């Protein structure tokens, strides 16, 4: 069996078990704990890659028979229940159908039964991306910096709104009034 270096593998398929990923421009790192894919049988989108008819796409299954509508390939998933895992994520009818190994079960080993891909499946290459559950709050009265901590602890990662603190203007509207006030809330 042919082998490639860890660096080559990382360049092609993204990080795997034991690799650490820096989160944005912080000093926080996560380590991949588990890889739910099969080494050497990864689904990859692109010219000359495996996500094509008869290879990674099952040519014997249709969308009506259960193949995915969308697959996110080789993505790093950060989840409070699963931990930090490398996997494919399948979407069917607008909902996550499964997290694991996707592909064509006719020729690929270890394909999760809910993650079969076909010609009806669209793809997002997730090789160097992180996928995590998150919520968005689109109407926030920003009255204190502590709101961000409360939001994060409840899964809200994105806030839209305005305000500069516990003032009547911030309580009544979501408008941020001026540069100096913005600097004070940050």
PLM-predicted stretches and their roles:
Residues 72, 129-132, 164-170:
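Glycine- and acidic
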Residues 2-66, 166-186:
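Metal-coordinating catalytic core of metallo-dependent amide/deamination hydrolases
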Residues 41-70, 77-133:
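Histidine-rich, glycine-flanked metal-binding segment
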Residues 34-37, 119-122, 159-161:
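A broad, low-specificity signal for short, low-complexity segments enriched in glycine/proline
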Residues 140-186:
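Active-site loop-helix segments enriched in His/Asp/Glu that coordinate
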Residues 129, 134-143:
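Histidine-centered divalent metal-coordination motifs
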Residues 125, 137, 161:
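Redox-cofactor binding/interface segments in oxidoreductases and associated redox assembly factors
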